[in-house]
């Protein structure tokens, strides 16, 4: 049996009596007690997540912008100011999603990317292949010397500033999807991005791994609650945010995964997968579902891989859970393209067909329920 990878915070999680699970080969906390309370902390105050299993990759060289024009489906032409970030899919030639990632622009010779843990080795191999094939001459450096802590919630930024006073001046004016580099803090040189995976405001802090446990403990002392993968999943589902490997993979087009907004077909550039996307178009709708109640009760919980029956054909739930914020069972589903918001569809739960209503994503954003 292969030993699990550990983040630099593994001992800290165990000291907090976290329930640990194998998450794609990483030993990660699923909760530290009440998952519901962790979820609520992020929606109402501030919670933090160890996301150090994700991999920071630095790209340097004179042709780094040209490389990303070709490598990703979104358009790095939008990245004009230092620290600006872009969410994109990395596609294969068939238009399938190799990974979803965030690209940060710092200078014309330095871009930084954060990729998912389970796909990191595959992504890096693909980047190296594209770099070699295109003769871009870039240096591509995975940075496992970094850890990442995501601090999320309406009070997250204030609590980060209380913990790292030097960060306030550099980040108080940051708009969402922008980052700043903050040098010389007690926790080393930090990259602080106004990004997240919860539907709340907050920061994701890239920190030298040798300093992350001290930062984690300091954030806790300033009232930030440690949160595990369980709350992270219910929060991202409420927020309408995809999980790689569950809502899309290398056989699924971003156009069929609710990610058309991340694909830029306007610029005349030859990015990997473009020809396949243009040839195939959109084949399915990616929608939200809310399980309908009868006599005030739902007959089950929506879960991944349940079949969805519609008048236009069958679909499938890709992610499902019970929403703590809504007190409803919610899901994402890939269904025939003719399915519309407001339609009632049937979901096969055990041996029953139960009605669910099609809604526009997201379900919740900034603490407010949007899908009723």
From Swiss-Prot:
It is an enzyme of class 2 (transferase). One of its GO terms (molecular function) is transaminase activity. GO terms for cellular component: cytosol; glycine cleavage complex. Keywords: Aminotransferase, Transferase. It catalyses: N(6)-[(R)-S(8)-aminomethyldihydrolipoyl]-L-lysyl-[protein] + (6S)-5,6,7,8-tetrahydrofolate = N(6)-[(R)-dihydrolipoyl]-L-lysyl-[protein] + (6R)-5,10-methylene-5,6,7,8-tetrahydrofolate + NH4(+). InterPro entries: GCS_T (IPR006223), GCS_T_bac (IPR022903), GCST_C (IPR013977), GCV_T_N (IPR006222), GcvT/YgfZ/DmdA (IPR028896), GcvT/YgfZ_C (IPR029043), TrmE/GcvT_dom1 (IPR027266). One of its GO terms (biological process) is glycine decarboxylation via glycine cleavage system. Its EC number is 2.1.2.10. The glycine cleavage system catalyzes the degradation of glycine. Belongs to the GcvT family. The glycine cleavage system is composed of four proteins: P, T, L and H. This is Aminomethyltransferase. It comes from Burkholderia orbicola (strain MC0-3). The lineage of its organism: Bacteria, Pseudomonadati, Pseudomonadota, Betaproteobacteria, Burkholderiales.
